[in-house]
């Protein structure tokens, strides 16, 4: 009986632990609500599409330097967030696990910091997003 209840609790908690998948418009609206300039939203949604397919819970495979990328914007753990048991410059001052939650606030704030320090080209997928992009106007 205890095992049954444990399974029920796990089943209830699993969606919360798994993160969530957004779509282009829901991401644009949430980022706008967090104060991201509207003229940047098409670029951010493009980056999120190509980096994580809008999934908040993604941890990328190891990079050539052994680092990993986290969350909807695939933020690197060598420079921007603290992974368990590994050195990091942790410029965003947060755990990498904070980038994997349903609440995208930490991911957005950290991504904005990356942008302010390194520009859009900090994302390897930027070449997909640097030209014409579909308008996000229909999202609002």
From Swiss-Prot:
One cellular-component annotation, GO: extracellular space
Tissue: Found in the midgut, especially the epithelium of the gastric caeca.
InterPro entries: Glyco_hydro_22, Glyco_hydro_22_CS, Glyco_hydro_22_lys, Lysozyme-like_dom_sf
Pfam families linked: Lys
EC number(s) recorded for this UniProt protein: 3.2.1.17
One BP term from GO: defense response to Gram-negative bacterium
KW Oxidoreductase (keyword) present: no
EC class of the enzyme, as a word: hydrolase
Annotated disulfide bonds: 25-139, 46-129, 81-96, 92-110
Active-site residues from the entry: 51, 69
Protein origin, superkingdom: Eukaryota
Residue spans crossing the bilayer: none
Signal sequence interval, chain numbering: 1-19
Function: Unlikely to play an active role in the humoral immune defense. May have a function in the digestion of bacteria in the food.
PANTHER family: GEO02684P1-RELATED (PTHR11407:SF36), LYSOZYME C (PTHR11407)
Family assignment from sequence similarity: Belongs to the glycosyl hydrolase 22 family.
Full protein name: Lysozyme S
Species in which this protein is naturally found: Drosophila melanogaster (Fruit fly)
Organism classification: Eukaryota, Metazoa, Ecdysozoa, Arthropoda, Hexapoda
């Amino acid at each position: 009986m205890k095992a049954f209840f444990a399974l029920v609790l796990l089943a209830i908690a699993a969606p919360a632990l798994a993160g969530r998948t957004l779509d282009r418009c829901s991401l644009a609206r949430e980022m706008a609500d967090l104060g991201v300039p509207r003229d940047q939203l098409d670029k951010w949604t493009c980056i999120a599409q190509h980096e994580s397919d809008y999934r908040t819970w993604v941890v990328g495979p190891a990079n050539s330097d052994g680092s990993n990328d986290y969350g909807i914007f695939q933020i690197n753990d060598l420079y921007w967030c603290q992974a368990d048991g590994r050195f990091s410059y942790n410029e965003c001052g947060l755990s990498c696990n904070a980038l994997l939650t349903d609440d995208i606030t930490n991911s957005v704030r950290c991504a904005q910091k990356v942008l302010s320090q390194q520009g859009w080209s900090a994302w390897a997928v930027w070449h997909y997003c640097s030209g014409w992009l579909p308008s996000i106007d229909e999202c609002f």
